[in-house]
Curated annotation (Swiss-Prot):
Part of the 50S ribosomal subunit. Contacts the 5S and 23S rRNAs. This is Large ribosomal subunit protein uL18. Belongs to the universal ribosomal protein uL18 family. This is one of the proteins that bind and probably mediate the attachment of the 5S RNA into the large ribosomal subunit, where it forms part of the central protuberance. Coiled coil: none annotated. The keyword Transcription does not apply. Keywords: Ribonucleoprotein, Ribosomal protein, RNA-binding, rRNA-binding. CDD domains: Ribosomal_L18_L5e. It comes from Methanosarcina mazei (strain ATCC BAA-159 / DSM 3647 / Goe1 / Go1 / JCM 11833 / OCM 88). GO terms for molecular function: 5S rRNA binding; structural constituent of ribosome.
Length: 174
């Protein structure tokens, strides 16, 4: 790997594709808590983290698999689930007394209308303060899952299920 004195081996977490240290430093210097959104094929995870010298402390978190408690039976890795998870996270965080933070998407590509920004829209709609532009949010039709209901018979009730789950989440935290 390193073949001479001029070769610099990147940090391990950078080599693994897990940490962007330049972005992390900027986020830490901002002095605000970080709202970390991570997505996989099956889930969306959101955490509110605060940096300490010993390591980051998690204040609040939500995972899209928690939506089953609110009657959501759709896929947990799609845009609809990302929005609902963001909504759940925002209301949980507000209930615990946290009011805002700054978005950390890590090494994920920043694409307008993506699941990351669907989760961000859910967080913002809950009343949690995150500085952002509304230009990056997906359309309301995509958030409700109408694009899935059009072509997939099993998910034809997804928009109704979305509204019912959203009402249950608001009912629990009001």
């Amino acid at each position: 790997m390193a073949t001479g004195p001029r070769y610099k081996v990147p940090f391990r977490r950078r080599r693994e594709g897990r940490t962007n240290y330049h972005l992390r430093l900027k986020l830490l210097l901002s002095g605000q808590d970080r709202v970390v959104v991570r997505k996989s094929a099956r889930n969306v995870q959101i955490q509110l983290l605060a940096p300490t010298p010993e390591g980051d402390i998690t204040y609040s978190s939500a995972v899209s698999s928690e939506l089953a408690k609110y009657g959501y039976t759709g896929a947990t890795g799609n845009t609809t689930a990302a929005y609902l998870t963001g909504l759940l996270f925002g209301l949980k965080s507000l209930q615990k007394g946290y009011e805002g933070g700054i978005l950390d998407i890590g090494l994920q590509a920043s694409s307008a209308g993506s699941r990351v920004y669907a989760a961000l829209k859910g967080i913002v709609d809950s009343g949690f303060e995150i500085p952002c532009s509304s230009d990056v949010f997906p359309s309301d039709e995509r958030i409700r899952g109408e694009h899935i209901a059009e072509y997939r018979e099993e998910s034809s009730d997804l928009p109704e299920q979305f509204e019912a789950t959203k009402e249950k989440i608001f009912a629990e935290f009001s």
